[in-house]
């Protein structure tokens, strides 16, 4: 990988990339390490599609697309989708799965900052799901997403709140007790408080439209969207 050749792609954590490269071959295993992403994807997709007024015919960018779970599902909704990621192996998995599924997605290995330098104002919808907590400078990602979306377009972020409850739920619970995700997936110090994310949004052309929590019930083994942003949350913003 050549992730340090230009100033635009400095915003890369190679240790984070290595975590996902190591398990990339199992990205589409519904019972594997990415089972939670498969489980929550219908909720994410539904929220994005509803808040954006549908995806059919729209040009969509998925930032930090990984193996393509969300990107493929948005393409199935009729969107023209580009997926960005700095992980070579996850992108190879995404490309192969799209080919096998007969789904057209344009997968590109570059940072969102690099992409923004070439494609500013070209997307109707930009999604950045579970990615901000894996880069050194998440505010830079927020700025780039704002640059990439058209006037009036929608940008969606999802990440984890930083507090004791999120540490218990997302790290201790999900990684060590329930073993829903591999140990070491999350670093609570990199979690982002909603006020911090909204502060970064306020410094761009984006405006907050809606925020919701994503909740897991271990008793029913189910996920749902609803009030409360103590752990996982999703933010809908719109370009002014």
Swiss-Prot record:
Role description: O-methyltransferase that catalyzes the 2 O-methylation steps in the ubiquinone biosynthetic pathway.
Identification of the protein by name: Ubiquinone biosynthesis O-methyltransferase
Catalyzed chemical reaction(s): a 3-demethylubiquinol + S-adenosyl-L-methionine = a ubiquinol + S-adenosyl-L-homocysteine + H(+); a 3-(all-trans-polyprenyl)benzene-1,2-diol + S-adenosyl-L-methionine = a 2-methoxy-6-(all-trans-polyprenyl)phenol + S-adenosyl-L-homocysteine + H(+)
Short name of any one Pfam family annotated for the protein: Methyltransf_23
PANTHER family: METHYLTRANSFERASE, UBIQUINONE BIOSYNTHESIS O-METHYLTRANSFERASE, MITOCHONDRIAL
Binding site for S-adenosyl-L-methionine: 44, 64, 85, 129
InterPro entries reported for this sequence: SAM-dependent_MTases_sf, UbiG_MeTrfase
């Amino acid at each position: 990988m050549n992730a340090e050749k230009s100033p635009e792609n400095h915003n890369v954590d190679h240790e984070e990339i290595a975590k996902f490269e190591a398990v990339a071959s199992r990205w589409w295993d519904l019972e594997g390490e990415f089972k939670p992403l498969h489980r929550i994807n219908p909720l994410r997709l539904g929220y994005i599609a509803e808040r954006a007024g549908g995806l059919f015919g729209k040009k969509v960018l998925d930032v930090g697309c990984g193996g393509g779970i969300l990107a493929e599902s948005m393409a199935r909704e009729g969107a023209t989708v580009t997926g960005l990621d700095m992980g070579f192996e996850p992108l190879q998995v995404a490309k192969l799965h799209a080919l096998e599924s007969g789904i057209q997605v344009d997968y590109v290995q570059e940072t969102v900052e690099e992409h923004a330098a070439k494609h500013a104002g070209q997307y109707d919808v930009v999604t950045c799901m579970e990615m901000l907590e894996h880069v050194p400078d998440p505010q830079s990602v927020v700025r780039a997403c704002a640059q990439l979306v058209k006037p009036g377009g929608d940008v969606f972020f999802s990440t984890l709140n930083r507090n004791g409850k999120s540490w218990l739920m997302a790290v201790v619970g999900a990684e060590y007790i329930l073993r829903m995700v591999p140990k070491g997936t999350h670093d609570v110090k990199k979690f982002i408080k909603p006020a911090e994310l909204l502060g970064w949004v306020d410094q761009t052309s984006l405006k907050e439209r809606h925020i919701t929590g994503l909740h897991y019930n271990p008793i029913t083994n189910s996920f749902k969207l609803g009030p409360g942003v103590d752990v996982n949350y999703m933010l809908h913003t719109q370009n002014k």
